[in-house]
Design a protein with these regions (language model features):
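Bacterial Sec-dependent N-terminal signal peptides
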Residues: 2, 10, 14-55
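Glycan-binding loop/region signatures in secreted carbohydrate-active enzymes
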Residues: 41, 52, 79-81, 95-97, ...
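Chitinase-like catalytic core of GlcNAc-active glycosidases
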Residues: 52-107, 111-115, 255, 301-436
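Short hydrophobic/aromatic patches on beta-strands that form ligand-binding or substrate-lining surfaces
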Residues: 84-87, 99-101, 151-160, 168, ...
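Extracellular glycan-recognition modules
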Residues: 96, 100-102, 129-190, 267-274, ...
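Extended recognition patches within non-cytosolic domains
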Residues: 96-99, 261-305
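Extracellular glycan-interaction surfaces
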Residues: 107-131, 152-162, 179-241
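Flexible glycan-contacting loops in extracellular carbohydrate-active proteins
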Residues: 234-259, 284-289
Length: 521
């Protein structure tokens, strides 16, 4: 079924690239029309005279890292695009950036050291009570809101039980944000969230042996998992419904005497699922926010699951794909509305975006801030766009993604970007039709967005029209047995979904090609 989806996906992407630098033509039989490519394979074609007004037709796509890791996005489908946006970053109100998978490479201090092996496990972290490991401030907080659930898991060998020794903690200006510590007696553990502490005792947890230990936190309910036992032990004590949303360093191993191995943080409830070495080919594991394997003697604190590692994997998947393409940083969500409303934050944001682009050799950035509705918000968003262009310079590719309900940025902002993508879809099924597609594009052009700068978005998913009820085209094909290339509605899991069929996307692409738009997304 996956091969069927890939075939359909490549068929669609092939159509999208068909009109690059030319007028759309359909030539099933007969003589090719004037202007089409003719000749035999291997014949030399006379080059056209360069046209300074010629623009490459944009075939753009977002990449979500979790979809890529679970093989929902192939190298071939990415290779069919000439512009790829890796959607991974989010801004804080002060203009700082965070990522869906932060780079949590940890620094070892004191006597925290790499050990090649210990008591049957290879590549481990050794702690003697005087050292610790600091993974920076990227974990258990978010510009999208406080964490209400997570799992922390690790293999641990306790050489000597020390009351208060930390498996991990976050402390801000002397106040505990969150801490997971050994308790007063062997087998006793305590979890502190803010000013509240809950405790648990499990006699299976003993010093002098390796154990898998995981704590899950779900809206204030904490559970402990030990070794292979899938039955959790509940913590006793009342905890708040979320972790204080404070940016503070994530520190492991302070005062701990023993060893750690295969330590991870996940945003879901994993229980014993992290007990084996983690691979990232299933949905739950893609939500692993940090993974320290301690198997690199030169960099024992290396985080093995980051957005930057995903970026390199995307680049590797594109090896051998024909043609040139841009890979750009996608920035969405977070506290963007607060950020654009503050001049100092806008400056910080622009400088941070530039730094990331340069550090990771990216081709530019895309802003997908949903949505500015008021005149003030649109004006502030426009200022952020203009300032970002000023900081990036003219040679870095910059775009914004807008929506038919929110596209009226300033003329200066329109001039500052290389193109504007218009998301002609949404939770409402009314946005999916060909007629609405045309009218939304016309409205944006009438407002003042140049037609050749407007990249029109099409949906590769279906919706029932109810918020939260969307299904990816991948699933409609793979699980819903969608085979009809003309069906704009389909029954899936007992509900009717509105989508764009292959034929509808073909028609929209043909319309974009024939009417001078900048591209398709």
């Amino acid at each position: 079924m996956r091969s069927k989806f890939l075939f359909l996906c490549l068929f669609l992407f092939g159509m999208l690239t068909a009109c690059k630098n030319t007028k759309w033509v359909d030539v099933p039989t007969g003589t090719p029309p004037e202007g089409s490519v003719t000749g035999k394979p291997g014949e030399t074609e006379e080059p056209d005279d360069p046209d300074p007004t010629d623009k490459t037709f944009i075939n753009c796509s977002y990449i979500r890292g979790d979809f890529f890791e679970t093989n929902r996005i192939s190298g071939a489908s990415m290779g069919a695009c000439n512009d790829l946006i890796y959607l991974t970053a989010r801004p804080y109100a002060d203009g700082d950036l965070t990522f869906d998978l932060p780079v949590n490479d940890a620094t070892l201090t004191g006597a925290a050291t790499y050990a090649a092996s210990y008591n049957g496990r290879n590549g481990v972290l050794k702690l003697d009570g005087t050292g610790k490991m600091n993974a920076g401030d990227g974990l258990l907080h978010s510009p999208d809101g406080a964490f209400k659930k997570f799992t922390f898991g690790t293999y641990i060998y306790v050489s000597e039980w020390v009351d208060g020794a930390c498996l991990f903690k976050k402390v801000d200006d002397g106040s505990v944000v969150i801490a997971f510590q050994l308790g007063a007696t062997e087998g006793n553990l305590k979890l502190t969230v803010g000013s509240a502490t809950a405790t648990v005792t499990n006699s299976a947890l003993k010093s002098g042996a390796w154990h898998y230990v995981a704590v899950t936190y779900d809206g204030g309910a904490a559970k402990l998992y030990i070794d292979t036992n899938n039955t959790a032990t509940d913590f006793t004590g009342s905890l708040p419904a979320s972790v204080p949303n404070t940016r503070a360093d994530f520190v492991m191993g302070e005062n701990l005497k023993g060893y750690l191995d295969e330590t991870f943080v996940n945003s879901l409830l994993m229980g014993t699922l992290g007990r084996n070495p983690i691979s990232f080919d299933n949905w739950n594991n893609t939500k692993t926010l940090a993974y320290w394997k301690y198997d690199d003697a030169a960099k024992p604190g290396k985080d093995s699951h980051t957005w930057a590692i995903r970026l390199e994997q995307i680049r590797t998947a594109l090896n051998g794909q024909a043609g040139d393409r841009k890979i750009r940083l996608g920035i969405a969500g977070g506290e963007w509305l607060k950020m654009v409303g503050n001049a100092t934050a806008r400056t910080n944001f622009a400088n941070n975006v530039k730094k990331v682009i340069e550090q990771y050799n990216l081709d530019g950035a895309d802003l997908d801030f949903e949505w500015a509705y008021s005149g003030t918000d649109l004006a502030n968003y426009s200022k952020a766009i203009v300032q970002l262009r000023e900081v990036l310079g003219k040679d870095v590719f910059l775009t914004v993604s807008l929506h038919p309900v929110s596209y009226k940025i300033s003329a200066e902002a329109i001039a500052a970007v290389d193109f504007i993508s218009l998301q002609c879809y949404g939770p409402s099924v009314k946005l999916f039709s060909m007629e609405r597609f045309k009218s939304d594009g016309k409205a944006a052009v009438d407002y003042g967005i140049p037609q050749d700068k407007l990249v029109m978005g099409v949906p590769f998913y279906g919706t029932t029209g109810t918020a939260g009820e969307q299904a990816a085209y991948f699933d409609l094909v793979g699980k819903g047995n969608l085979t009809n290339t003309s069906a704009d509605t389909w029954s899936y899991e007992g509900k009717n979904y509105t989508l764009n069929s292959q034929n509808t996307i073909r028609q929209k692409t043909q319309y974009v090609c024939e009417n001078g738009f900048g591209g398709i997304m």
